[in-house]
A protein has these predicted regions:
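Extracytoplasmic/secreted cell-surface and envelope-processing proteins
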Residues: 26-28, 64-67, 126-131, 155-158, ...
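Hydrophobic/aromatic beta-strand patches that form the interior of the parallel beta-sheet core
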Residues: 16, 57, 119, 146-148, ...
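VWA/integrin I-like adhesion module and closely mimicked acidic/polar interface patches used
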Residues: 89-93, 104, 114-117, 122-188
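Membrane-embedded segments
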Residues: 1-116
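C-terminal signal-anchor/stop-transfer transmembrane helix together with its immediate cytosolic
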Residues: 1-8, 212-264
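Extended, hydrophilic extramembrane loops/domains of integral membrane proteins
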Residues: 182-213
């Protein structure tokens, strides 16, 4: 009785969502802005999962593992709601570093990479590194990268604390979607690129493609609760105690005069 750990095995996919939290994701060409729309879509994705594992990497100039690989979707939704630019101290958009971190964040044997995908959500404005080289390495490992471009080619200004971000000349900075690199990353790894629209961020299309992939065996350790059985043990103990009194009543002359178990 009580609880114990129980290992469950199921077929599924490991998905590492890699989310851009740089200032450019605050652009308002999506309502209320790119990042808030992304967070909402991720939360809806987690609500519909059953046997897959998920993790979260957030990035700007540097990446950070926000949520290690897990099958606890309630916890995953809670972490998704907390996605914010303040999670990363260095601004910029280093997509290559983020993909590298996502590859390292998968669980278990890195040599067995089928059934593992990275979903990269960004506006594609890569400033700091060579994301293509990391994509080529992911392809060699058998990890597919699905990319979602959020933003518009025309772009939009960004606000922080109600103030528009401006360049050194005092002009408002406009963040535009860079699709070329995102499409190339997906193509190199055998994934797919989707451009977000006002109606859908694109996760539904990505998940449909992922569901057609070869799955892998995933082990999950869970706490298993049992019904308390102490009442039955208590009854058995009382029966044994009564039997002991019967024996004592018959054999012990000091108890015989009490006549507890004798008819008068």
């Amino acid at each position: 009785f009580g609880s114990k750990l129980r290992e469950e095995k199921a077929q599924g996919i490991e998905m590492m969502l890699t989310v851009d939290v740089s200032n450019s994701m605050l652009a308002e060409d999506f309502e209320p802005n790119r990042l808030e729309r992304t967070k909402y879509a991720i939360g809806k994705l987690f609500e519909g999962l059953q046997q897959d594992r998920v993790g979260l990497v957030v990035f700007a100039g540097d990446p950070k593992v926000q949520l290690p690989i897990t099958s606890d979707y309630r916890m995953a939704r809670a972490f998704a709601r907390r996605i914010d630019p303040s999670l990363v101290s260095v601004q910029g958009t280093a997509i290559g570093k983020a993909l590298e971190q996502a590859l390292l964040a998968f669980s278990g044997d890195t040599e067995q990479s089928h059934g593992r995908v990275i979903i990269l959500i960004t506006d594609g404005e890569n400033h700091d590194d060579d994301a293509i080289a990391v994509a080529e390495r992911a392809a060699q490992m058998g990890v597919k990268i699905f990319t979602i471009g959020i933003g518009t080619p025309e772009g939009a200004p960004m606000q922080i604390g109600g103030e528009f971000i401006k360049d050194e000349a005092g002009e408002m900075v406009v963040s535009k979607l860079n699709e070329e690199m995102l499409a190339r990353i997906a193509d190199i790894t055998g994934g797919a690129y989707v451009r977000s629209s006002k109606q859908s961020i694109g996760l539904d299309e990505i998940v449909k493609a992922i569901n057609e992939m070869e799955q892998t065996e995933l082990s999950t350790v869970r706490f298993e609760e049992f019904n308390e059985q102490y009442q039955y043990l208590l009854i058995a103990a009382l029966v044994l105690l009564l039997l002991e009194f019967v024996v004592l009543d018959r054999r012990n002359p000091l108890l015989a005069h009490l006549n507890i178990f004798r008819e008068k």
